[in-house]
Every structure is written in C-alpha cells, then in structure tokens.
Amino acid sequence: MGMPSWLENIVFYEIYPQTFLDTDGDGIGNIQGIIRKLDYIKNLGCDGIWLNPCFASPFYDAGYDVADYKKVAPRYGTNEDLKELFRKAHEKGMKVLLDLVPGHTSTDHEWFRESCKAEKNEYTDRYVWTNNVWDDFKDVGSITGSIRGFSDRNGCCAVNFFSVQPALNFGFARCDKEWQQPMDAPGPMATREAMKDVMRFWMSMGCDGFRVDMAGSLV
C-alpha cells in the first residue's frame, strides 16, 4: 500500500492535549478544547492535527507509557469525545493522526501484569524477557535497559526508555541468545496482531492514521 496522496502537502498542527485548551476548569487541556479550536487551527493554514498520546496512562512519561490502547485518558475526555473530534475535523476538511507507541507499554498495562506471572499464559511472550532474573541485556545493543526482581516470573524484562516502559516483543531478525525469539514465533506474531487490532479500532472511529513513536525500537 502506497502513501495516501493527502500526505504529500499537508501541514500538521501538533497538539499535546494537556497543554491545550481546558474546558472544564481542572487545569488540564482536553479533547473538547481541541474541538473548540478547530477553526483557529484551520485558519492558521493547517489541514491536519497530530495528537500526542491521549490514551489511558499513569503519565510517568507524558502519556508515552500506555496502560490501555483502546481508552482515552479520563483527564482528556472519553472515546466518544475523540470520535467527535475526528468527525468535526473531517467536516472542516482536516485530518487527524494519533501518536501510536507500539514498542512498549506502561508497567500498568494488563498485558504486562499477565506477562509477569510465573504460569504460562497468552501474554507470557508479549514482552522481551530473558530466561533468568540474573541474565540481562548488556550484550544486545538495541536494548537500553531492564527491570527485574519485582514479579513471580524468573526473568529480566527489557525496557525501551524509562523503567516503567517494558519492551513489547516483535522478535529478532538474528537470534544469538537463548531467550530471543524469531519474528515469526507465536509471541511476536501475536504482538503484531494486537497492535494491528489497536489501529483498526481507532480507524473504525474515524482516525486518519498514526505517527509511530520510537519506530526504531521495533527492528
């Protein structure tokens, strides 16, 4: 699939939701505030909005630590508010891109809680784990850190940035370590399908596409 033609010349206005217009007086910007300012953004000459992370999160990293990919953070509003933003932006001939963080989640994500369990389950291989808590990732250049000693599982989990952001398992092109899985292993394949499901979910509501955060962490 090629690049959509509308991407060739579009001008985007980037919005970090909590710093934009606050419509309910809690001191935090929200999606309704963005809706109110669509004409303002359009009049600036922008025909697209790039919305920084707006999903449910504990916000240890400005929302780039996602706890639920299919739920808008309550501080910003609801899923229906975001759906309304898509619709009203389209009425004005504007596009909306969401920030997608596919390389890692929050440690608060249900996937990670399940992956931490000693018992084998469908999320055991959703993240990058070693086979022993004493094994780390010092010889793997693509991994910058790890967390360990906090779960029932005997293993060390890779992180992509901060210690609250465990790395999702998309597999490895070359497997040099016992714990590494190839890209076509069941775990990595399930991770990719889960992320495709997230994208389908929001596009069915009217999202026009995604800006992928830390895309390099996927390869």
Residues of each region from the PLM?
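Acidic/aromatic-lined carbohydrate-recognition and catalytic surfaces
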Residues: 2-196, 204, 211, 215-219
